[in-house]
Every structure is written in C-alpha cells, then in structure tokens.
Amino acid sequence: MLHKKYRPNVAAIIMSPNYPNTCEVFIAERVDIEGAWQFPQGGIDEGETPLEALYRELLEEIGTNEIEVLAQYPRWIAYDFPSNMEHNFYSFDGQKQRYFLVRLKHANSIDLNKHTPEFRTYQFIHLKDLLKKIVPFKRQVYRQVIAYFRREGYLGC
C-alpha cells in the first residue's frame, strides 16, 4: 500500500460580523478555477503554528486578519486532490487541514486584491446554502467540520 503525502494546511470558516444575529458564512470563488467556491485556506510554513498560518493566510487571501477566533477543530482532516484536477502541489496527494471557526470583525475590510489574488469574488451566504455552492470534493470535509462546531455549541445556527 502506498503512503500518501498530504500538505499541512489551515482553513477558515468565516462568519459574518453580524454573527450570531445572522448565520452567514464567507465563501470565495477561485481565480484559477471558475465556479470553484470555497473557504479561505493555505499552507502552513515550516516553523509556523496553525494559528500563525491562519492569520497570515487570511491577510494574504482576503486582505484582512481582523477576526475573532471562536473555535478550532481538534484534529487534522485529510482529503485527496481529485485525479482530474491540475494543482500546484504535485509532490502531494492532497491536504491535511486544521479548521478554525472565526468571526470577521469588519466586512468592509475585505480586499481580495491586497496581495496576488487567489479569489475573483466573494459573498456571504446562509450556512444552509453552503454545500450547494462549494466544490464537490470538499463537501464531506465541510459537512464534518460544521457538524462538529454545531455539536460542541460553537456554531449556533
């Protein structure tokens, strides 16, 4: 049996600044794959903690890291890249991710063009509509993480 190699990564479930009054979550459409909506995520650099990577990645991808961390998923979750997907991480079979549930402090602070853009546009959608919108190969992981945050009382919608 082959040993799979996974890239360490963080991902952010970003609730709107109006949470918990509204149950809207941030998603963004990738620049390189039209119609591919997802949560912000990115690799963990050597010597960096997952929390440090979270703040760095959010600043790079959405132009702000002004967030309140509400919870962290307690384990790594791995997923494989789809075989038909071209990706920039050819030495990896997929990614192992550490998920954070966060609340954005100021919606007007989002700037997708602050660094090299990874997303073409973004929106806040109701959490109940999330799984219909995002790329299919991430749905199971998103479902698992959201169920955990709900079950543990961190996500009240």
UniProtKB/Swiss-Prot annotation:
Keywords: Hydrolase. One of its GO terms (biological process) is mRNA catabolic process. Gene3D superfamilies: Nucleoside Triphosphate Pyrophosphohydrolase (3.90.79.10). The keyword Hydrolase applies. It comes from the Bacteria. The keyword Hydrolase applies. One of its GO terms (cellular component) is cytoplasm. One of its GO terms (molecular function) is mRNA 5'-diphosphatase activity. A motif (Nudix box) lies at residues 42-63. Its cofactor is a divalent metal cation. Residues 5-147 form the Nudix hydrolase domain. Accelerates the degradation of transcripts by removing pyrophosphate from the 5'-end of triphosphorylated RNA, leading to a more labile monophosphorylated state that can stimulate subsequent ribonuclease cleavage. Belongs to the Nudix hydrolase family. RppH subfamily. HAMAP family: Nudix_RppH. This is RNA pyrophosphohydrolase. It comes from Helicobacter acinonychis (strain Sheeba).
